[in-house]
């Protein structure tokens, strides 16, 4: 599943091709994605793309009329192609520009989304409820500490809660907790303030490094130019069950927390 770094890498990849260009046509081949694609997305036709933004794992293609909102879901990909490029299986949506460039949305599992937000309308509820962005000053370890004081849930589940902070998905939660030396099973309220202050900084570093490396390619994710992400080469615990810990050489363990595979070193994480 594409997580925040992968979505940010996609944004960085498509932005230079879209910003300043006019949308000629939006082609919807399959309306039934996670939610039905609204007919109102066609209101963007004829308008210039002013910006391409990201909020959590949502991408906003801004025009004077409103914003096309894209979510990659479990397996979504965005490709920049010539508008004459033949479609392949699972190519559901084309955003065709007047210069012949096309942003093509492919989603094999159809858990992605294409929504519309008209200029002046309030934010869609699920977006308005999101917590702060992890790479901004609105998020830090103090926030984690303050919000965790009554939380009995495992700390890994806590930092993956989008109301606490957006974008700390399963891969990066595992990696951040390993670097911080925190057992992912530990109750959130039992983690010390000192540990949370360090964890806040580590989350920022891990996500920034993943973006710099082009995201993590495990199965479905590729960059907008079709190239893979390389952060998978730097994973220290995720997906390494049974292998030796890079620090102490103990065996990496795996359990399920919140229906997610969780990887950790019992010796290094307390």
Curated annotation (Swiss-Prot):
Its cofactor is Zn(2+). It catalyses: Hydrolysis of DNA containing ring-opened 7-methylguanine residues, releasing 2,6-diamino-4-hydroxy-5-(N-methyl)formamidopyrimidine; 2'-deoxyribonucleotide-(2'-deoxyribose 5'-phosphate)-2'-deoxyribonucleotide-DNA = a 3'-end 2'-deoxyribonucleotide-(2,3-dehydro-2,3-deoxyribose 5'-phosphate)-DNA + a 5'-end 5'-phospho-2'-deoxyribonucleoside-DNA + H(+). Binds 1 zinc ion per subunit. Its EC number is 3.2.2.23, 4.2.99.18. GO terms for molecular function: 8-oxo-7,8-dihydroguanine DNA N-glycosylase activity; class I DNA-(apurinic or apyrimidinic site) endonuclease activity; damaged DNA binding; zinc ion binding. DNA binds at residues 90, 109, 151. PROSITE patterns: FPG_CAT (PS51068), ZF_FPG_2 (PS51066). SUPFAM superfamilies: Glucocorticoid receptor-like (DNA-binding domain), N-terminal domain of MutM-like DNA repair proteins, S13-like H2TH domain. CDD domains: EcFpg-like_N. A zinc finger (FPG-type) spans 236-270. This is Formamidopyrimidine-DNA glycosylase. It comes from Pseudoalteromonas atlantica (strain T6c / ATCC BAA-1087). The gene is mutM.
